[in-house]
């Protein structure tokens, strides 16, 4: 049989033997070389069918179509009479993908990039794509200064036309900057200019995280920094003429040279605003005022443009265009700024939508909105909604997106995109100290119950000295106006002796109800009523305790430690909160002030009042809010009314993870001074340091904390980026260095009567500590670790350097 052979093998272009103008009619099509690809699939990809008359062009199109499927690396077309014989060589299938030597780039990231290029297990191997990936990865290494890096793809054949693909990396070392030169600078020294760069050719010995590694992206950023530095100081003609980056022969060193032209300094002669101002010319004019003789400043010009856009955005102009054109007069060295404004269309809000709130109900988010559907768009109202969502503490991130409605010239949708965090926490605390040993506490809190926004807490403690249970529920939107309603039930069996406090037992239970009233965006008031029953027993005679009992008309014996006393109190509870933090957890900017207090009302056995003031202020010191200074204070004071004293069990305490770290919880402040026991049940274990008078025991000092009716605590904290934590988890982990100080005192202590004992009425006995803290928003809830070293303490204070707590952040 005579066979006329046509051979065509090309990846992109094909050629065929000419069959003549009339061609031939295909009566059958046969394939050779198919393994993975089905015959039917191959036929469907061909433009030629049985019965078609074909010519050279049809054959070429067939070749191209088969190559376009990506399944073949070679295609041959043969004619055997009226039969078309297609011989193919399939591309091998990737059986596995592995990596070797990659340290700077993680395997997961490499796999994602490969899959984005169509390279994955089970797919055909495209050698052209692999070559492009090799080059792309090498370019990446070059951009971060690793010029000796190489990436090679190793393809290992396997049976059944399969291959193993292995990318072998030789990353090498990062080239270090040997010198940065700036040529053409006269007004500023090179050192002064380089001090604002991210890249460095010298690193001080104390900068343990600094390096001299070169990165292309950082150089681009530094050039913009250099440009802004000059433009902000009046150099309107400043120009970067060229930049050279030179490698040493061993590719380990880099020299960077930046050639600039400074030009002269220019002053602003005026600002002229024109265009479509949408009737807000007077307000825009206020934003463009300049001081006579003011130097041209590029940053101020940009800020002015942004301020005009924000102003128009508040009135519904969602997409204004503002362009500033400096008109430079070289003769008198002045710049006249011409600002062209096009407000564009004014937009209504058609819908407000929420994305990412898988747990939180839409209504919980919608009630925080200040922008209304159907109203003019207000960018400030949209931003207020974002702030309020952040302050809820339910979300890791909140972003907004204003989307135009297709086909409408004046409508937009506002989309809030949230990333929810775990708002429930299992509170479990462990502390260890040189004197205290190990201590525990536990509880459960859910701030967004079933996505309704309700805060529900069930807390319980069971240890050697306390059995405590509490149920609390708060509805933040009891009314549509934002009036909140909260309630609490609790039971507490507390044996102070076993807690290293003054010796007594108190079994109490009670309830309270509180209403919260929003005043404006940042202020709210609270008011409520409470009831508590206290049953005191096993009260060992102690000066401050007996002083309270005497004020209540009780005269227990100082030789009896089995005294008991019961009270029923009704209280009016009140509070005020100012909250302008940027978000509900891990804030980075703003402040919060919380004032709480209570006073007994008629029908109570006790008569007293108690006030606590907490403040926190966050001040970011960089634009990204990664470096933040935090200042916190806590003030407390209480006293009796009508000649009575405030109950000793209502005293303030300090020490522990929420006040002065490095000290055991509640141990800072006045210590118990006991009367000597004469009864038959006298326990010699309570015989501490007893003074004598006329041969008889007088009073006994101890290390048992009793608290006081006044407290002052302050903390200064420096929040820093957490080392070795990627940006993905930066919002979930916080590291800080702190300095805590605080004191507790008793204003009713009579130092003249007890001259031989410490003056517990002196507020100047301030304790201090310093240390480091780590907070993590874990799946279990917030975890807080701290290590603090007390450096100012007094006799009787108990240190607890390491403290660990789940369930509390600040």
From Swiss-Prot:
GO CC entries: Bam protein complex
Keyword 4Fe-4S: no
Coiled coil: none
Record InterPro entries: Bac_surfAg_D15 (IPR000184), BamA/TamA_POTRA (IPR010827), D15-like (IPR039910), OM_assembly_BamA (IPR023707), POTRA (IPR034746)
Domain of life: Bacteria
A biological-process GO annotation: Gram-negative-bacterium-type cell outer membrane assembly
Keywords assigned: Cell outer membrane, Membrane, Repeat, Signal, Transmembrane, Transmembrane beta strand
Localization terms from the record: Cell outer membrane
Transmembrane intervals: none
UniProt xrefs under Pfam families: Omp85 (PF01103), POTRA (PF07244)
Main location: membrane
Signal peptide positions on this chain: 1-20
UniProt domain POTRA: residue ranges: 24-91, 92-172, 175-263, 266-344, 347-421
Primary role: Part of the outer membrane protein assembly complex, which is involved in assembly and insertion of beta-barrel proteins into the outer membrane. Constitutes, with BamD, the core component of the assembly machinery.
Family per similarity comment: Belongs to the BamA family.
Assembly, per entry: Part of the Bam complex, which is composed of the outer membrane protein BamA, and four lipoproteins BamB, BamC, BamD and BamE.
NCBIfam families per UniProt: OM_YaeT, PRK11067.1
Protein name per Swiss-Prot or TrEMBL: Outer membrane protein assembly factor BamA
The organism's taxonomic lineage, starting at the top: Bacteria, Pseudomonadati, Pseudomonadota, Gammaproteobacteria, Enterobacterales
């Amino acid at each position: 049989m005579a066979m006329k052979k046509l051979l065509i093998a090309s990846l992109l272009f094909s050629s065929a033997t000419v069959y003549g103008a009339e061609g031939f009619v295909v009566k059958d099509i046969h394939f050779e070389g198919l393994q993975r690809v089905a015959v039917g699939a191959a036929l469907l990809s061909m433009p030629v069918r049985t019965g078609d008359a074909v010519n050279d062009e049809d054959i070429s199109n067939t070749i191209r179509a088969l190559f376009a499927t990506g399944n073949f690396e070679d295609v041959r077309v043969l004619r055997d009479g009226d039969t078309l014989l297609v011989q193919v060589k399939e591309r091998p299938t990737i059986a596995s993908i592995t990596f070797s030597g990659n340290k700077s780039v993680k395997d997961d990231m490499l796999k994602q990039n490969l899959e984005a290029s169509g390279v994955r297990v089970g797919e055909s191997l495209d050698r052209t794509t692999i070559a492009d990936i090799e080059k792309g990865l090498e370019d990446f290494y070059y951009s971060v200064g690793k010029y000796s890096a190489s990436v090679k793809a190793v393809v290992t054949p396997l049976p059944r036309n399969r291959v193993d693909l292995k990318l072998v990396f030789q990353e090498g070392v990062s080239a270090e900057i040997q010198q940065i030169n700036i040529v053409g600078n006269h007004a500023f020294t090179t050192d002064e200019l380089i001090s604002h760069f991210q890249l460095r050719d010298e690193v001080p010995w104390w900068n343990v995280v600094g390096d001299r590694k070169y990165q292309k992206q950082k150089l681009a950023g530094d050039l913009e920094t250099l440009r802004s530095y000059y433009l902000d100081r009046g150099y309107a003609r400043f120009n970067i003429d060229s930049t050279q980056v030179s490698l040493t022969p061993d590719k380990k060193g880099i020299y960077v040279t930046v050639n600039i032209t400074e030009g002269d300094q220019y002053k602003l002669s005026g600002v002229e605003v024109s265009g479509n101002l949408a009737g807000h010319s007077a307000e825009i004019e206020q934003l463009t005022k300049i001081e006579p003789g003011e130097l041209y400043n590029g940053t101020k010009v940009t800020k002015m443009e942004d301020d005009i856009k924000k102003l128009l955005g508040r009135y519904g102009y969602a997409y204004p265009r503002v362009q500033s054109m400096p008109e430079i007069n070289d003769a008198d060295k002045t710049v006249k700024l011409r600002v062209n404004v096009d407000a564009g269309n004014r937009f209504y809000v058609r819908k407000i939508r929420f994305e990412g709130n898988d747990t939180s109900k839409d209504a919980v988010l919608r009630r925080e909105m200040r922008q209304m559907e159907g109203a003019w768009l207000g960018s400030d109202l949209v931003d207020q909604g974002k702030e309020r969502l952040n302050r809820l503490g339910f979300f890791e991130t909140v972003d907004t997106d204003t989307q135009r409605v297709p086909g409408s010239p004046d409508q937009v949708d506002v989309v809030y995109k949230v990333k929810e965090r775990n708002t429930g926490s299992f509170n479990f605390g462990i502390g260890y100290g040189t004197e205290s040993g190990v201590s525990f506490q536990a509880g459960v809190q859910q701030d967004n119950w079933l996505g309704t926004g309700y805060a529900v807490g069930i807390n319980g403690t069971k240890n050697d000295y306390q059995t405590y249970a509490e149920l609390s529920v708060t509805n933040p939107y009891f009314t549509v106006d934002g009036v909140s309603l909260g309630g609490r039930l609790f039971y507490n069996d507390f044996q102070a002796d076993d807690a290293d406090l003054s010796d007594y037992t108190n079994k109490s239970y009670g309830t309270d109800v509180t209403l919260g009233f929003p005043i404006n965006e940042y202020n709210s008031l609270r008011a409520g009523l409470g009831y508590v029953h206290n049953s005191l027993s096993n009260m060992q005679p102690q000066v401050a305790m007996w002083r309270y009992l005497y004020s209540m008309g009780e005269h227990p014996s100082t030789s009896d430690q089995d005294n008991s006393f019961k009270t029923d109190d009704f209280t009016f509870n009140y509070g005020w909160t100012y909250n302008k933090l940027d978000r509900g957890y891990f804030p980075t900017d703003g402040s919060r002030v919380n004032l709480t207090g209570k006073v007994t009302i008629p029908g109570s056995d006790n008569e007293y009042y108690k006030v606590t003031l907490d403040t926190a202020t966050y001040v970011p010191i960089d634009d990204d809010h990664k470096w933040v200074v935090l200042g916190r204070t806590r003030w407390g004071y209480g006293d009796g009314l009508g000649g009575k004293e405030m109950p000793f069990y209502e005293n303030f305490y300090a020490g522990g993870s929420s006040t002065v770290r490095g000290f055991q919880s509640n141990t800072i402040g006045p210590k118990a001074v006991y009367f000597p026991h004469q009864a038959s049940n006298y326990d010699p274990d309570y015989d501490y340091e007893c003074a004598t008078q006329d041969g008889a025991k007088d009073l006994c000092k101890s290390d048992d904390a009793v608290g006081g009716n006044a407290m002052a605590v302050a903390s200064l904290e420096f929040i820093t980026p957490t080392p070795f934590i990627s940006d993905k988890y930066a919002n979930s982990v916080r590291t800080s260095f702190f300095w805590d100080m605080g004191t507790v005192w008793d204003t009713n202590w009579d130092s003249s009567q007890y001259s031989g004992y410490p003056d517990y009425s002196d507020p100047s006995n301030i304790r201090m500590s310093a240390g480091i803290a780590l907070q993590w928003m874990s799946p279990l809830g917030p975890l807080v670790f701290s290590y603090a070293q007390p450096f100012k303490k007094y006799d009787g204070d108990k240190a607890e350097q390491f403290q660990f707590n789940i369930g509390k952040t600040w």
